[in-house]
Amino acid sequence: MEIKTFLEGALKEDLGHGDLFERVLEKDFKATAFVRAKQEGVFSGEKYALELLEMTGIECVKTINDKERFKPKDTLMEIRGDFSMLLKVERTLLNLLQHSSGIATLTNRFVEALNSHEVRLLDTRKTRPLLRIFEKYSVLNGGASNHRLGLDDALMLKDTHLKHVKDLKSFLTHARKNLPFTAKIEIECESFEEAKNAMNAGADIVMCDNLSVLETKEIVAYRDVHYPFVLLEASGNISLESINAYAKSGVDAISVGALIHQATFIDMHMKMA
């Protein structure tokens, strides 16, 4: 969904048929407002906020940038426009910044806990309906990378896909003939044997799903000897406390759905000058 279309929908959701305050406002005038943080975090949502302000004729006098850290009481944005329009935009603007910064902040905590420049931290497709692009943009601002944006990015085969596949190697041979040349094939595995079979069958990426660090290390050791060009991804209930151990197991990437679905809003407010 294009940013403008997304923002138009978000604004309309809040405005309904119009802000009732306009009926009681005797005369409109120019005013200045400040968006300030009430807790620390990593800023995200700048691109969406600036587009929203431009759409509504509000001037952004000053803003901090995506990926910047902030502390409680810091001024994140200074905006100026018609008093009535500032009030119309207030909640939508805050929702965008609070939600996006919440994801970026939690993602950054995982990046710091990962403590590795060799292992990539990835998000997942566990996103809120119609918010995927927005939420994955927020992950990038937190310092991680995006996994697939959708089903058309790569062929990922899970247990539900493979339930009725009798010969995995033959299936992958058939798949490659029907996929774009650049499309990767990733197979989700829940045991050493499944991972071994996936590599033997020709998978480009093997996901070690819900496996212990020890089990993951065994798969890494097998990969390193027999299929050094296969990429390994660890996934499944990986926490801030365990992510560093998984990083040290030798995998190439770690995907964490919690970056998005466990993130909470960063508290902010808007105050008039």
Residue ranges and their predicted role:
Residues V220:
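A conserved short alpha-helix in the GNAT/GCN5 acetyltransferase fold that borders
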Residues N210, G236, A258:
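Short secondary-structure boundary segments
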Residues H269-A273:
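Active-site loop ensemble at the mouth of alpha/beta enzyme cores that anchors a bound cofactor
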Residues M1-E190, E194-A201, I205, K217, ...:
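Acidic/glycine-rich phosphate/pyrophosphate-binding loops and surrounding catalytic core
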Residues A234-S235, L240:
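Structured functional modules or segments
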Residues R223:
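Conserved hydrophobic residues forming the short capping helix/wall of the S-adenosyl-L-methionine
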